[in-house]
């Protein structure tokens, strides 16, 4: 039953965010965190995110502006690795407090507090009307890539920042979508490599 719920949620969220270009992590990661440890939830969300973007790559990948992809995705991939390593570090810290809820033992950890804060911030950004007008000068594209990649690696939340920094890059609508998809895949591959190595070393050895 749990697997059915997880698969259904992943399918529905992927469909809802297909055209927006962002929001999948904000919606899906908290749902996964109900069933898995937070770091595993972030990794599982990354797998769905990558699969979703590979599907979109087949549709719009050829329309991407690869000059912009390089400017955005190179710093994004580097900082995604750093963010993913930081996620692993936080996951290994000692719980700050313990309590019981509905007969189950629960803990308060630095990682949970950080992720909860970031979910709240990104949710507010994505829901606030002013966010629709939020855009940055094209010269800040590498900075946008770095920020998007870092928060993507740490929490899986990256799409809102990616869109805000690419929307004024002078791209046609199709090129914007294609560029966003290719950039997201680069980040996903970078962070999933770190998640895979750190998860294997921590849980399977």
Locate the predicted segments by residue.
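Selected transmembrane alpha-helices and immediately adjacent juxtamembrane segments
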Residues: 1-36, 126-180
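Structural motif marking the loop-to-transmembrane transition
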Residues: 1-4, 8, 62, 66-70, ...
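Structural signature of hydrophobic alpha-helical transmembrane segments
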Residues: 1-3, 32-50, 106-118, 146-156, ...
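Residue-level signature of the transmembrane alpha-helical core
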Residues: 7, 11, 15, 46, ...
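Small-residue-rich segments of transmembrane alpha-helices in multi-pass membrane proteins
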Residues: 34-38, 73-84, 141-154, 186-189, ...
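Membrane-interface alpha-helices at helix entry/exit sites of multi-pass transporters
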Residues: 37-44, 66-71, 170-182
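Selective hydrophobic functional segments
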Residues: 43-101, 189-205
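Transmembrane helix exit motif
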Residues: 53-59, 83-96, 109-137
């Amino acid at each position: 039953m749990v697997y059915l719920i997880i698969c259904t949620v992943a399918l529905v969220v992927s469909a809802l965010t297909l055209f927006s270009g962002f929001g999948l992590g904000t919606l899906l990661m908290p749902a996964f965190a109900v069933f898995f440890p937070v770091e595993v939830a972030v990794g599982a969300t990354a797998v769905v995110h990558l699969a979703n973007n590979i599907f979109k790559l087949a549709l719009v990948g050829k329309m991407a502006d690869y000059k912009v992809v390089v400017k955005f995705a190179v710093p994004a991939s580097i900082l995604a690795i750093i963010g993913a390593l930081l996620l692993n570090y936080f996951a290994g810290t000692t719980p700050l407090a313990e309590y019981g809820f509905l007969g189950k033992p629960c803990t308060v950890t630095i990682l949970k507090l950080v992720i909860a804060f970031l979910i709240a911030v990104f949710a507010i950004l994505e829901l606030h009307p002013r966010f629709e007008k939020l855009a940055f000068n094209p010269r800040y594209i590498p900075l946008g890539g770095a920020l998007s990649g870092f928060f993507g690696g740490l929490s899986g939340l990256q799409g809102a920042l990616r869109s805000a920094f690419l929307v004024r890059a002078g791209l046609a609508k199709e090129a914007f979508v294609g560029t966003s998809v290719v950039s997201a895949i680069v980040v996903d591959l970078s962070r999933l490599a770190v998640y895979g190595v750190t998860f294997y070393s921590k849980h399977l050895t």
